Amino acid sequence: MPLKLDIKRRLTSRSDRVKCVDLHPAEPWMLCALYNGHVHIMNYENQQMVKDFEVCDVPVRSARFVARKNWILTGSDDMQIRVFNYNTLEKVHSFEAHSDYLRCIAVHPTQPLVLTSSDDMLIKLWNWEKMWACQRVFEGHTHYVMQIVFNPKDNNTFASASLDRTVKVWQLGSNFANFTLEGHEKGVNCVDYYHGGDKPYLISGADDRLVKIWDYQNKTCVQTLEGHAQNISAVCFHPELPIVLTGSEDGTVRIWHSGTYRLETCLNYGFERVWTISSMRGTNNVALGYDEGSIIIKVGREEPAMSMDVVGSKIIWAKHSEMQQVNLKTIADGTEIKDGERLPVATKDMGACEIYPQTIAHNPNGRFVVVCGDGEYIIYTSMALRNKAFGSAQEFVWALESNEYAIRENNGTVRLFRNFKERKSFTPEYGAESIYGGYYFGVKTSSGLAFYDWETLQLVRRIEVQPKNVFWNESGSLVCLATDDSYFVLGVDTAQVANAVETKEGLEDDGVESAFNVLGEVSECVKTGLWVGDCFIYTNSVNRINYYVGGEIVTVSHLDRTMYLLGYVPKDNRIYLGDKELNVISFCLQLSVLEYQTAVMRRDFERADVVLPTIPKEHRTRVAHFLEKQGFKSQALQVSTDADHKFDLALQIGDLEIALKLARESENSQKWSQLADVASSKNNMSLVKECMQKANDLSGLLLLSTASGDAQLLEVVGAAGSAQGHHNLAFLSAFLRSDVERCLEILIETNRLPEAAFFARTYLPSQMSRIVELWREKLGKVNEKAGQSLADPAQYTNLFPGLGDALRVEQHLQEERARKAPARLAANLPLNSERHPLQELFAAEQGAAGQHLEEKVKPAYVPAQAVVSSSQVAEPTSAADDDDDLDLEIDGITLDDNIDTTDVNLDDDFLSDD
């Protein structure tokens, strides 16, 4: 049966003819040697070119990464070997290696050795630690040596392919070949070793259009692969998958099964002739080089064939065709297991599998394990790996009952088995693209998903969703349908379905309508998943472990690479995962936490109260966050052990007592500020004052003191502002307290002398001379003329009209400021804009000083145009003067004689002469 290999193109790069490709072991890079003399490094993850080396102006026929040195080695038609640092683009070294075109470079996997082959029919060994000295020359070929490759199982031997129609096997310690393999009728272009330990095989491709598989121990040809229409230019045994890749000048890459040698697939991307193929252990990526560019394909799936039994003690996996077992119970007691770290487990070989495993799955009770691959399945006992059943199938799934399973065949027929015997079979109405196990038997059709009852095959429900996977919880009450970009969590009414199946009531063409109800939809791609109670644990496309419970998603951890869920072990409170390198890691996930969250979502608070004491203290804050999201903030406050979280919760529910206690414990200014805001909304002004003082919120204290009329607090704010350099607050505090002297001193201290001068002119004219002198002294240091231009009011009184009155007003207001009025009288006092100090001074001099304060009423409104200085006070005028002015104005009026006055009636009395 076929391997069913998924093949996806990861990178397509158009370029000049590509003669050689190589993959970097650590970075997502492909190295391309071009016929035009350039070398490219392509990043196949972001599809970008990383580097472009212009090596020479002749073809570069070979290039290799040396990752441990950050090097690229190139061999070209100018007979030169060049060494570049691929990070700095610096040419480290270059030398002439051969007397003809260089064909191939092979780098020793561990030692500082490099092999080169050439059209001069020689193979040479170089040592870069000895100044690139040539340590050995291998002679024996009688034509161009096209390719050389190290034996991955014995790095001291290598093979070479030559146009003399032979393949030779060499040893590093000898100048002559160990033996020669003959069988091709034309020149041999390429050669490669089989990487597995079970077969001593070589593969070669030649101009006779044939690919030959050789047993290099028996020195015989064991298989010949035919099918290409032109010369074979590249061959490759994949280091992990059971496949052989061959490339030809006919433009195709053929993939063959390395066990049966049947053709699996043929790829033709239209890039003309194939020149090179490269693969690497640890990845399913394969690089292809063509006339018109390069391509990277991903062959097969990277998810490892691994499975954990239901108890969680044993893991079975496949390493190539070898089955191995890991027993987690063998981890020594007392071993500290850290989240995300590789577990120190010992593997036990269980023997070879008869098929190449692509998936492995335990049955629900863990007694049996099924291995699927090559279109076949084999059921083994999980302990001894004894064969219990086998057959042909495209898919295999277990039911929740441990002895039931189903298979899907090529023709779309589905067969159900119980105790390894076929029980029923049917062909779904809309075909069967995929099948799913679990509480109900799922079949994905062309139109959606259909669930059937395992016992009767009665249709339970059709759902218009085409999932990639279906995950059931143990009780069958919940199911997750995972699609390409989202997943749906459905509740299942199993009792109603059972009743409908038994009584045939409520059954429709699409099944039982109320069998499923949607509980949630999440736009997230599920890679692997499993249920623990009512919690769905899964890994997503961005390498996170999350779990879904009652509509809430909780992140357990972020992964640094792709991992696959194996299972959850309740007694360990840990989830186990594996990666493609067959490493096992684990993360702590408390079962009691999951049970508590499940109980809360079911609103079973009695059960939640029982479970809560079993939750370790270090996990209670996570539970509190969950309760908060569910709206149970008071309960979250009681459960949480994190002081910051408790403080936030106390603020949210308005519990000022707990919040105050926590704030006093932490002495965090931000918390005091937050508490002040909440206390303000609760009208607890004494607490607001304490919080603002603890938070050193001078602006807030300024507002509070002015709003409450607290002069003492206002003075404290001013002093603190001065001490801490907040001069604006200090100034405002003094100004609000009518301490204009302090305001002036603050302006002087802060070197704001121009402002101080204007302030003194307005409020303290007696200080003007002192300020002007300070200002003149400072300004003179910058511009002496400008300093001298400042006028001192004491010397130039003529330039300051009304200064005398201003000094008298200052004295008067100073006495008034000494009599502090209570804040409660503010509503009865005039605003500053309504007051006229000079008139108040005149009134005071006439014996009515302070009348507006004692009577607690506002004075009569005085217009703003009222006189404010002695120079502006008008002398009293007589009635005779007024008459003279009026006569002058009348004499200046010119009357129009043309005005019709017939309609004007004047009073005779008005016209009569006195």
Swiss-Prot record:
Predominant subcellular localization, coarse grouping: cytoplasm
Record keyword Protein transport present: yes
Molecular functions (GO terms): structural molecule activity
A cellular component term, taken from the record's GO annotations: COPI vesicle coat
CDD domains to which the protein is assigned, alphabetical: Coatomer_WDAD_beta-like, WD40
GO-annotated biological processes: endoplasmic reticulum to Golgi vesicle-mediated transport; intra-Golgi vesicle-mediated transport; intracellular protein transport; regulation of lipid storage; retrograde vesicle-mediated transport, Golgi to endoplasmic reticulum
Localization (cell): Cytoplasm; Golgi apparatus membrane; Cytoplasmic vesicle, COPI-coated vesicle membrane
Mapped WD repeat ranges: 13-54, 55-94, 97-136, 140-180, 183-224, 227-266, 352-390
Keywords: Cytoplasm, Cytoplasmic vesicle, ER-Golgi transport, Golgi apparatus, Membrane, Protein transport, Repeat, Transport, WD repeat
Cited SUPFAM superfamilies: WD40 repeat-like (SSF50978)
Membrane topology: Peripheral membrane protein
Cited function: The coatomer is a cytosolic protein complex that binds to dilysine motifs and reversibly associates with Golgi non-clathrin-coated vesicles, which further mediate biosynthetic protein transport from the ER, via the Golgi up to the trans Golgi network. Coatomer complex is required for budding from Golgi membranes, and is essential for the retrograde Golgi-to-ER transport of dilysine-tagged proteins.
Family according to the record: Belongs to the WD repeat COPB2 family.
Quaternary structure, from the entry: Oligomeric complex that consists of at least the alpha, beta, beta', gamma, delta, epsilon and zeta subunits.
Protein name: Coatomer subunit beta'
Higher taxonomy: Eukaryota, Metazoa, Ecdysozoa, Arthropoda, Hexapoda
